[in-house]
Every structure is written in C-alpha cells, then in structure tokens.
Amino acid sequence: GTFLFGLTALAAVALVVGYRSRLAALVLFVLLLSLHARNLLIANAGNWLLRRLLLWCAFLPIGRRWALDARHVAADRGRAVSIATLGVLVQVVVVYAVNAVLKLRGDRWVEGSAVQYIYQVDSLTVGLGDLVAGTPLLSVGSHAWLALLVCSPLLVLARGHVRTLLVAALAGGHLFMFATLRLGVFPLVSVASLLVFLPPPVWDRVE
C-alpha cells in the first residue's frame, strides 16, 4: 500500500541523487516488479524496459560520476567495460531489432500506413496528436521509423558521428511519440536507454 509506494519513491530519489546507486537500483527493481505484478493494468513495454534497465544498473558503475557516491571513490575517467556494459547495450538493441522484425512482417508498416492508422485511434492521441493526425507526413514517418529500427544494430556496430546521429534520430522519434501519443513511460524510458550509446566526446562536452 502506501508504505510500498513510499519506499519506491525513496529508492527512486536515492538513485537519482546517486546515493548507494547500485543498491538503490536493485531495490527499485524489486519494488517496481512487485508493484507491476499487483496491478497488471499499468503493465506496458515501458515498464518492462525500465525494470530490465534497473537490473543492469545494479551491476554497472553508475555511482562513479555525477552521484553522491562519486565523493567516496577515486577520480577515474577510464572506460567501464564488463559483461554488464555489454549486456545493457545488447538489451536495448534487441528491443529495437525485434521490433523491426515484427514490423517488417506486417503490411501496414511496409506500405507506410501504420502510423496514420495509429493516429486515427482517438484513445491513443494526446497533446499534439490531434494536430498531426491525418497529415501526409505520417506516411513518411512510418517509413522513417521503420528504417531507424532496421538500422538499430548500428548502435553497437557504428562509432562516432554515425552512432550519435542514430541515437539523436531514435530519441527524437520517441519524444515525438511522447508529445502526441498516450504510451505511458515507454517513450521517456526509451530515450534514457539510448543515452548509454552516446560516445565519450558527447559526455565530455556535457561536463
């Protein structure tokens, strides 16, 4: 009940500020798993992806930078390479690649009418969704999104500007979904998952 929600919020805050980061990620994973199991009505792809990202975070050095935990560890600007880093990268790419395969099996995506059909469902549109519904650009959007999904393996195969541009394009697509469709946390979680693919020069500029 209320206690479980409070504990979940506390774990989320700890993760955001980077206090006992790995432990906070693991605790949050367990608590969200419990909450989602108790309420299947809120279950969606976003929650599924969020839980898996949290589980990977429990094995990643997420407290090494931009976290309270960073105060207690020696400064280290080296690369973090492990089975966990490989796992989280593969996890995200698999989501996109499987999505691409499923869409290629359907006629609507190949024809370019899938996105137009989605925006005709009033219960799904939100915000700017009603403004873009029915516009011819949605057909272009169908082909463009399918092309991005097909190219998703380049997230791990490509480097430098190519990878950065692909991350930006996929993130832009998700933000467009967030502004126009009622998809829960899926678009935002997807954007967060893409951040792990940004190359070091991007993060150096951020700092």
Q: Predicted regions span which residues?
A:
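Extended, low-polarity transmembrane helix blocks
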Residues: 1-105, 136-207
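Membrane-interface interhelical connector segments
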Residues: 74-75, 107-132
